[in-house]
């Protein structure tokens, strides 16, 4: 394990905007892929006549390796810069990418947003159906304020390497991000050609007009978020493994507090208590885990079937809250008609995804002031924000955003799209007996 400070990075962006190629190039330039793997990927890409996609092939190779080897390794892409040790969360290109992005983004410290400069591709990413828009909204909801916008495929802009095209894209995205409340001093824009590595780790000879940082330099300008070590322990479960000779090994990231070997913990909403026998991260044993650590931990007295993804771990002295009902401030980002009482989207919060019924629309808010504009409206439409009460269909752990931000912000999904995003103001707890 590197002694450098550690950051979790997520790579987001519209399909075909060059996420995989960018990540592959970065890992290769930083020397975190061996020659043999690179050669094999190049040959595989050549065979299929997709030479320009050799870096994307590299990632797929890594993905297969991960699927074959059942390690407790949540993430498989790690690299170092001069200043930091990075883990890349969840390779892009998943069928359930947005769903995974929601759970992944809730664990990330910063994001790289890949945006293609190719004519038509940028425009489709920013269309109403586009994922560039959707991913920007989700990144903001999930509390990701540090974003590096990589404007990719500058070599196929028209004309190639065109500064005007770069500026046009930058201005459009800046305007959109500002409208969602991003602090633009924490957002960097970089024109990139991943396939040749221009402005990834080395400066581009073709874009002399750009004098900002390379991607690698921008990564070193990121800041480490403060660790909430003084708060109670909260660890949402990402996966649960059963490993022969070891036992049950849940995996997840510590969001707040500290977990130590020997601690008495409880899994909610299951209400199952256990003792922590060992903790490890990236195959290194730890005596204690702090916020930001992606860990696998072995527990005594728990069967694999007792716990699942979306459960939250806390100490028995301060168990995570299970909500009978919760109240949130919601923005409707997409809906063909309107949302009324009884509407039941799937709520994605930390690593959980549970259908929740709208039990009351308390008030519609004035978008300019955020103050109440109408009490108990019949419905809310796209672009509107409101205070809404939800009732989870199945037991669900959530917390007030002001107490535990990662467990207090969520996205609502329906019909394969993000319908809305929200922040929880209040939770009515349900009584769960600890076994």
Curated annotation (Swiss-Prot):
It is found in: Cytoplasm. Signal peptide: none annotated. Keywords: Cytoplasm, Elongation factor, GTP-binding, Hydrolase, Magnesium, Metal-binding, Nucleotide-binding, Protein biosynthesis. Residues 193-195 are annotated as: G5. Mg(2+) binds at residue 20. GO terms for molecular function: GTP binding; GTPase activity; translation elongation factor activity. Residues 90-93 are annotated as: G3. GO terms for cellular component: cytoplasm. Residues 69-73 are annotated as: G2. It catalyses: GTP + H2O = GDP + phosphate + H(+). CDD domains: EF1_alpha (cd01883), EF1_alpha_II (cd03693), EF1_alpha_III (cd03705). Its EC number is 3.6.5.3. Belongs to the TRAFAC class translation factor GTPase superfamily. Classic translation factor GTPase family. EF-Tu/EF-1A subfamily. GTP hydrolase that promotes the GTP-dependent binding of aminoacyl-tRNA to the A-site of ribosomes during protein biosynthesis. This is Elongation factor 1-alpha.
């Amino acid at each position: 394990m590197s002694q450098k400070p550690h950051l979790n990075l997520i790579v987001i962006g519209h399909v075909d905007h060059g996420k995989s190629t960018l990540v592959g190039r970065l890992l290769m330039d930083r020397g975190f892929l061996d020659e043999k793997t690179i050669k094999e990927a190049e040959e595989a890409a050549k065979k299929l006549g997709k030479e320009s996609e050799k870096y994307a092939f590299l990632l797929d190779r890594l993905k297969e390796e991960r699927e074959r080897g059942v390690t407790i390794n949540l993430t498989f892409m790690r690299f170092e810069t001069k200043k930091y040790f990075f883990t890349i969360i969840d390779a892009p290109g998943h069928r359930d990418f947005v769903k995974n992005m929601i759970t992944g983004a809730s664990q990330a410290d910063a994001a790289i947003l890949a945006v293609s400069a190719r004519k038509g591709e940028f425009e489709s990413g920013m269309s109403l159906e586009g994922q560039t828009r959707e991913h920007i909204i989700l990144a903001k909801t999930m509390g990701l304020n540090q974003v590096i916008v990589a404007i990719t495929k500058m070599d196929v802009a028209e004309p190639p390497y065109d500064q005007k095209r770069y500026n046009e894209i930058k201005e459009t995205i800046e305007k959109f991000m500002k409208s969602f409340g991003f602090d633009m001093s924490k957002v960097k824009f970089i024109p990139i050609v991943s396939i040749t590595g221009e402005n990834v780790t080395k400066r581009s000879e073709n874009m002399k007009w750009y004098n900002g940082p390379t991607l690698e330099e921008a990564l070193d300008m990121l800041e480490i978020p403060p660790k909430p070590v003084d708060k109670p322990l909260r660890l949402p479960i990402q996966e649960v493994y059963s490993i022969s000779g070891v036992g049950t090994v849940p995996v997840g990231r510590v969001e707040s507090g500290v977990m130590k070997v020997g601690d008495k913990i409880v899994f909610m909403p299951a209400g199952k208590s256990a003792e922590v026998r060992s903790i490890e991260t990236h195959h290194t044993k730890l005596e204690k885990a702090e916020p930001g650590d992606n860990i696998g931990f072995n527990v005594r007295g728990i069967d694999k079937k007792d716990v699942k993804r979306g459960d939250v771990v806390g100490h028995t002295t301060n168990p995570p809250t299970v909500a009978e009902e919760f109240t949130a401030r919601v923005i409707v980002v997409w809906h063909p008609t309107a949302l009324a009482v009884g509407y039941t989207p799937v709520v994605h919060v930390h690593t959980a995804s549970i259908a929740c019924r709208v039990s009351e629309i308390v008030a519609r808010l004035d978008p300019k002031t955020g103050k109440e504009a109408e009490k108990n409206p019949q419905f809310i439409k796209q672009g509107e924000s409101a205070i809404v009460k939800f009732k989870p269909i199945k037991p669900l752990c959530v917390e007030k955003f002001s107490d535990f931000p990662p467990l207090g912000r969520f996205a609502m999904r329906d019909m394969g799209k993000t319908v809305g995003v929200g922040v929880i103001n209040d939770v009515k707890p349900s009584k769960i007996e600890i076994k």
